[in-house]
């Protein structure tokens, strides 16, 4: 099972919160103290809370559940996309479109259009169009890919949201809450943990910290999928009892 240690978190700078003047009092239980005007997060809380979240994600993945990685802050986008792809899951790394979950019917139509344009771009359809029309469709394709590329193969609502930066992604969290989708989120000292089922108190800006979170969640999802594949193989008679 995937777990993260205190040392991992210290090396990644997970314990560095925001300046004390920007703090959210709702995060008080998770703050150790302050140093040079910056809040220090109590990793005695973060380590077990993150490991509990990883166990939950692994369990979801073991039941063929879908994990949606969400991180649209500049520092998070690349890590979110890479980690989601590394475990065959889904991501939103550019901008959260209002209604992405709660208005799934409309989003599904946009995904259908994206796939149509993808087909047209490779089957020669674009070549038969005027330059202007081809350019317009290319731009439409790029825009849709940027917004929906990470969820185009999700095939329905996710089973859990993993979020970097609860404050920044509050719309995504609210939509998940409205639909009863569990939320795992990294919550910094300037944010409110409202609507988060699995709170991970930690730095949500430092690249090393973000990569630690995303790679650990990907490893947990892969671990869960491995269990699922092992069970499936046993059911199919591929694994003989020793």
Curated annotation (Swiss-Prot):
GO terms for biological process: translation. It comes from the Bacteria. PROSITE patterns: RIBOSOMAL_S2_1, RIBOSOMAL_S2_2. It holds the Pfam family Ribosomal_S2. One of its GO terms (molecular function) is structural constituent of ribosome. GO terms for cellular component: cytosolic small ribosomal subunit. Belongs to the universal ribosomal protein uS2 family. NCBIfam families: rpsB_bact. This is Small ribosomal subunit protein uS2. It comes from Shewanella denitrificans (strain OS217 / ATCC BAA-1090 / DSM 15013). The gene is rpsB.
């Amino acid at each position: 099972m995937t777990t993260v240690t205190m040392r991992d978190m210290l090396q990644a700078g997970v314990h560095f919160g925001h300046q004390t003047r920007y703090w959210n009092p709702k995060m008080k239980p998770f703050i150790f103290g302050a140093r040079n005007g910056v809040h220090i997060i109590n990793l005695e809380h973060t380590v077990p809370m993150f490991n509990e979240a990883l166990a939950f994600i692994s369990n979801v993945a073991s039941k063929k559940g879908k994990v949606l990685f969400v991180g649209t802050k500049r520092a998070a986008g690349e890590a979110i996309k890479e980690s989601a792809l590394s475990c065959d899951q889904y991501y939103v790394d550019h901008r959260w479109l209002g209604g992405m979950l709660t208005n799934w019917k409309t989003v599904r139509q946009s995904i259908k259009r994206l796939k149509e344009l993808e087909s047209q771009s490779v089957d020669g359809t674009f070549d038969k169009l005027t330059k202007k029309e081809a350019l317009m469709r290319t731009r439409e394709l790029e825009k849709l890919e940027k917004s929906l590329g990470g969820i185009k193969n999700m095939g329905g609502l996710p089973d859990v949201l993993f979020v970097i930066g609860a404050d920044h992604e509050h719309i995504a969290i609210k939509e998940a809450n409205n639909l009863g989708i569990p939320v795992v989120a990294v919550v910094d000292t300037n944010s409110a943990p409202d609507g988060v089922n699995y709170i991970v108190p930690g730095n949500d800006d430092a690249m090393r910290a973000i990569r630690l979170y995303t790679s650990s969640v990907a490893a947990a999802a892969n671990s869960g999928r491995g269990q699922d594949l092992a069970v499936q193989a046993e059911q199919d008679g591929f694994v003989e009892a020793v």
